[in-house]
């Protein structure tokens, strides 16, 4: 949030967002970032950022409890159950364009952040196809489900998929097989530039899109100089992406 305030003070209106190795996280974090990046008008009027599509039973339960199925842009985030109390009031950058660096390691909440901003902001995707995890889950522990936790369940937990998310246009851009890049570029381990180096292939492409000039003869290509390097085969284990939503009180209280 402090960096957002700094960017706002400096008049930043385009951002390179590197989510290549981000497998997801909490919906709260996703909404904090989105509310910093989205147009000020969308945030001040609390427009819909994303909505959850549950089965009929959960949808009816939410409605009976008067709880919304929508996540809206906001500036105040108060969630004592996870010790979050933050404000983005002075950190709305109001980006005109986002260059999203993506790859197979981008999943779940990171895909949802980009997809949720697409109806409001120009999102340009650079890299390779993302993982394609379009579900939202609840992280359940025995302590949350029982008044008195049995000893054999002390270290027990389960991550349950409960919904599919959609953006304000009713779309899930990463469904079914991941976000498709506007510009397809593979990471090049042979060149081995540090993340953040302006010559690293994906960042270089984003900066050129933003107007940065590079010498036509290439800047320090390392491929020829390092013939002994060889890329490892891709990891075959499925990525465990996360998009975690806080469990509504009516669910945890009902189960106890």
Residue ranges and their predicted role:
Residues 1-14, 19, 23-256:
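C-terminal "post-core" interaction segments
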């Amino acid at each position: 949030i402090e960096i957002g305030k700094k960017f706002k003070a400096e008049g930043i209106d385009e951002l390179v967002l590197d989510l290549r190795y981000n497998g997801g996280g909490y919906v709260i974090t996703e909404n904090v970032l989105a509310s910093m990046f989205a147009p000020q008008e969308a945030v001040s009027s609390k427009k819909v950022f994303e909505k959850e599509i549950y089965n009929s039973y959960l949808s009816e339960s939410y409605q009976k409890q008067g709880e919304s199925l929508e996540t809206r842009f906001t500036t105040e985030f108060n969630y004592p159950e996870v010790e979050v109390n933050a404000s983005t009031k002075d950190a709305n950058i109001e980006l005109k364009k986002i260059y999203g660096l993506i790859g197979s390691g981008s999943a779940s909440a990171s895909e949802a952040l980009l997809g949720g901003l697409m109806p409001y902001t120009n999102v340009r995707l650079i890299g390779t196809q993302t993982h394609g995890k379009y579900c939202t889950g609840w992280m359940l522990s025995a302590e949350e489900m029982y008044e008195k936790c049995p000893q054999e369940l002390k270290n027990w937990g389960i991550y349950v998929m409960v919904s599919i998310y959609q953006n304000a246009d009713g779309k899930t851009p990463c469904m079914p097989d991941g976000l498709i890049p506007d510009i397809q570029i593979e990471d090049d381990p042979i060149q081995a530039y540090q993340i953040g180096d302006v010559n690293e292939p994906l960042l270089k492409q984003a900066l050129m899109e933003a107007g940065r000039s590079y010498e036509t003869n290439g800047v320090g290509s390392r491929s020829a100089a390092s013939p002994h390097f060889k890329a490892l085969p891709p990891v075959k284990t499925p990525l465990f992406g996360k998009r975690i939503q806080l469990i509504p009180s009516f669910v945890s209280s009902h189960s106890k």
